Curated annotation (Swiss-Prot):
Keywords annotated in UniProt: Flavoprotein, FMN, NAD, Oxidoreductase
Naturally occurring in which organism (per UniProt): Burkholderia lata (strain ATCC 17760 / DSM 23089 / LMG 22485 / NCIMB 9086 / R18194 / 383)
Cofactor(s), names only, from the UniProt record: FMN
Encoding gene (name): azoR1
Record's protein name: FMN-dependent NADH:quinone oxidoreductase 1
Cofactor: how and how many bound: Binds 1 FMN per subunit.
Catalyses which reaction(s): 2 a quinone + NADH + H(+) = 2 a 1,4-benzosemiquinone + NAD(+); N,N-dimethyl-1,4-phenylenediamine + anthranilate + 2 NAD(+) = 2-(4-dimethylaminophenyl)diazenylbenzoate + 2 NADH + 2 H(+)
Pfam families: Flavodoxin_2 (PF02525)
GO molecular function: electron transfer activity; FMN binding; oxidoreductase activity, acting on NAD(P)H as acceptor; oxidoreductase activity, acting on NAD(P)H, quinone or similar compound as acceptor
Amino acid sequence: MSRILLITSSPRSTDSLSTRFAHDLARQLAARDAAGAVTLRDLSNDPLPHIDDAYIVGRMLPSDARSAEQAQAVELAQALVDELRAADIVVIGSAMTNFGPSTQLRAWFDRVIWPQVTFRYGESGVAGTLEGKQVYLVTASGGIFSEGPYAPFDYQSGYLKHLLGFIGMTDIREVRVEGTVLGAEAVQAAIAKAGQELQALVEQAG
């Protein structure tokens, strides 16, 4: 059984190309397995609160020493980690916002990157605890950031891959939907190219 966690995060919700392609990719990956199941974490329509003092302090305390507010904050993070840990495949849709991922997606990472839970410090450095998962990134941007003069300003793709790798998720494939504000022809070309890349990934997945 393939357990797929689909995470969408674009503020544009269903009008977003990253959301559209992420849903399509998750659906096709699930269709390979008669028992495949998709769990949706919609960070646009159901945003997470940003981390605060209650969470930072609460996660460092024993459970019986937490206030009600601290316990609630830590329980939310634990639920997100459990959801992520249970998945075999993770599909993340991310639309570039001011050169990086949206605050909605960052809020999710701020909850699941948890010392001694999703990564540990050891003699050889940091080791993630979420190995063995396949990750698919669907990233969208108004401009072209995979190459050309704006490539140095892509603080989305590499940043997300670094965060995922930090917690042990290093098997990452990416579909880019680029140039979405460069006119109708550019949008259609971006959609066609992303569709081809998506199909290739599905075929590679078997």
